[in-house]
Amino acid sequence: MAKRSKAYEAAVAKIEEGKFYAPADAVTLAQDTNPSKFDATIEVAFRLGVDPRKADQMVRGTVILPHGTGKTARVLVFATGDRAEAAIAAGADFVGSDDLIEKIAGGWTDFDAAVATPDLMGKVGRLGKVLGPRNLMPNPKTGTVTVDVAKAVNEIKGGKIDFRVDKHSNLHFIIGKVSFGAQQLVENYAAALDEVLRLKPSTSKGRYLQKATVTTTFGPGISVDPNVTKVLADA
């Protein structure tokens, strides 16, 4: 195991072992214990009481974080004609059809989100093995298969993110940067949590939100009290 840096060990020392922090305290502590010299990303991971192998327990959706993630997403749009022009005007980073499909089939995935018009999904669907594992496949349920590509691009650039529970029943969200105000981080955390709770499958039995952890890019994990579900009321 690689030896931890002195900065990391100092960060760990500030976190009370076995304690579950309120969300507001957790994000403040994450800012205070960031061992990196750069403006690190702050992420939250939720462990859910679901079995993602069962279709009726797959938790997937979108959320618009009120303060964004701290970085501007690189958006790719599969479109032609007027819709391609609309995507370009909206600020899409990559726009095309067959050319992009061929490039992605070769393994290129240097973008953060993908949008497609319905008429191109027959071709885009063939990229499932490349885009699927990276959660980049356009999907009508997340608003990324649409004729209104400009709206989709604007929402993604404005902080809308897609999420899907992984095979270990975890969900991961970027909620901002260390440089964010603490209240901004709390409000982003609350937006993510509210949507996760709203999407609880009816077939999920027992405790749904089992664990929550806040961390910076290279920082230690900070356990958040999973019983606090009304975050802004308790902040």
Swiss-Prot record:
Signal peptide: none annotated. PROSITE patterns: RIBOSOMAL_L1. SUPFAM superfamilies: Ribosomal protein L1. Keywords: Repressor, Ribonucleoprotein, Ribosomal protein, RNA-binding, rRNA-binding, Translation regulation, tRNA-binding. One of its GO terms (biological process) is translation. It holds the Pfam family Ribosomal_L1. GO terms for molecular function: rRNA binding; structural constituent of ribosome; tRNA binding. The keyword Nuclease does not apply. It comes from the Bacteria. InterPro entries: Ribosom_uL1_bac-type, Ribosomal_uL1, Ribosomal_uL1-like, Ribosomal_uL1/biogenesis, Ribosomal_uL1_3-a/b-sand, Ribosomal_uL1_CS. One of its GO terms (cellular component) is large ribosomal subunit. Part of the 50S ribosomal subunit. PANTHER family: 54S RIBOSOMAL PROTEIN L1, MITOCHONDRIAL, LARGE RIBOSOMAL SUBUNIT PROTEIN UL1M. Belongs to the universal ribosomal protein uL1 family. Binds directly to 23S rRNA. The L1 stalk is quite mobile in the ribosome, and is involved in E site tRNA release. Protein L1 is also a translational repressor protein, it controls the translation of the L11 operon by binding to its mRNA. This is Large ribosomal subunit protein uL1.
